[in-house]
């Protein structure tokens, strides 16, 4: 094993230990079984190479967003924001059980939430397309949201 692999394994062990400590905090009120389930889902997401861009360079966690769009105040916290020279990706984690099978099954509330985030982030990164996706922790699976449907929800919310 080379030094880089050893360092990566050490980082993985530290991440898992930190997650265990966090979940075990009595203030969360999580039973042991729930802690194990959440930990397993979280580690599966982080270990899946398909999600590497969401957690790699250029990505940020828990990004607060606030703005006034078409006279309406929009605020929230983006779970992951990936900023690249040619695009921006907004990712929100969802834990629905079972997760929706298709875009048509995604609750309207999530569409509105992501449409609002997209409108706010679009004011900052107006020179780049802003994409949105939901990361379902069960599976795990990344579901990119259709821009046309996001646009429709933004119109319904009076954000355009």
Give the residues covered by each predicted segment:
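Structural signature of nuclease core domains in nucleic-acid processing machines
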Residues: 1-160
């Amino acid at each position: 094993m080379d030094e880089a692999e050893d360092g990566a394994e050490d980082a993985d062990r530290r991440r898992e230990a930190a997650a265990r400590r966090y979940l075990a905090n009595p203030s969360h009120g999580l039973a042991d079984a729930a802690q194990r389930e959440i930990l397993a889902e979280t580690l599966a997401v982080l270990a899946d190479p398909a999600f590497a861009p969401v957690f790699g360079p250029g990505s940020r966690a828990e990004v607060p967003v606030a703005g006034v769009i078409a006279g309406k105040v929009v605020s929230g916290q983006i779970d992951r924001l990936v900023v690249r020279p040619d695009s921006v990706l907004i990712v929100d984690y969802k834990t629905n059980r079972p997760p929706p099978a298709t875009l048509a099954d995604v609750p309207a509330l999530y569409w509105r939430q992501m449409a609002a985030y997209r409108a706010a982030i679009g004011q900052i990164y107006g020179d780049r397309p802003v994409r949105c996706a939901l990361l379902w922790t069960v599976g795990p699976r990344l579901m990119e949201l259709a821009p046309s449907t996001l646009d429709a929800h933004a119109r319904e919310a009076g954000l355009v």
